[in-house]
Amino acid sequence: RNYFKLDTIVFATGYDAMTGTLINLNITGENSLNLKDYWNEGPKTYLGLQIAGFPNMFTITGPGSPSVLTNMPTAIEQHVEWITNCISFMIKNDFKKITTSEKDSVEWGKQVKEAADKTLLPTVKHSWYLGANIPNKPRVFMPYAGGLPTYTKICENITNNNYKGFLFS
C-alpha cells in the first residue's frame, strides 16, 4: 500500500461547460420554446450575449463569447458593461423588449467557428470545449477564439451601428 500525505483532495468529476447551467434551469422562451430543445444541435447565441427566441435574457460568458479563452474577470466586465449600456439605451428610447434573430445567431456561430478553425483547439476531439465530456452532447466548439480585444471591437461596431443584429420594441 502507498500512503500520501495530502492537505487537500480535489475531485474533478467533470461538468457541462458553458451550456449545462443554463439548460438545467429549464428556461422557456417565446412560444413555449425550451432552451434545451433549441440547443439540441449545439448552442446558438448572438455574441454569446443573447439567444434568439428568449427576449430580454442576456447571458454573461455564454457560448459564443470569448469567456473561457481569456481572462474571465475581464470578459465578465466587458459583458456587464455592454449589457448595462444596452439597457440604458433601451430605457432612454422607451424600449421594453430586446431580442435577436435566428439568422444573426447562425451568422455569429459561423464567425465563432472561423475563429476557432484558425487554432488547434477544435482538433482536440475529447475536449470539454467541444462538450466531449458529456455523453450525447453535440460536438460544437463553443467559445469565441478571436480574442477579447477583437470581440470588444465587434461589440463596439454593433453598438455604433444601432445595435445591428438586435431587435427592439
Predicted regions, residues:
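Short amphipathic beta-strand/extended segments with alternating polar/hydrophobic composition
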Residues: 5-7, 38-39, 140-143
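C-terminal, flexible cofactor-proximal segment of oxidoreductases
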Residues: 45, 58-169
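Short amphipathic alpha-helical surface micro-motifs
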Residues: 8-10, 37-43, 109-112
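Glycine-rich loop(s) and the adjacent beta-strand/alpha-helix scaffold that form part
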Residues: 16-65
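Short hydrophobic core segments
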Residues: 4-16
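Structural alpha-helical scaffold elements that stabilize or flank donor/cofactor-binding regions
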Residues: 2-3, 50
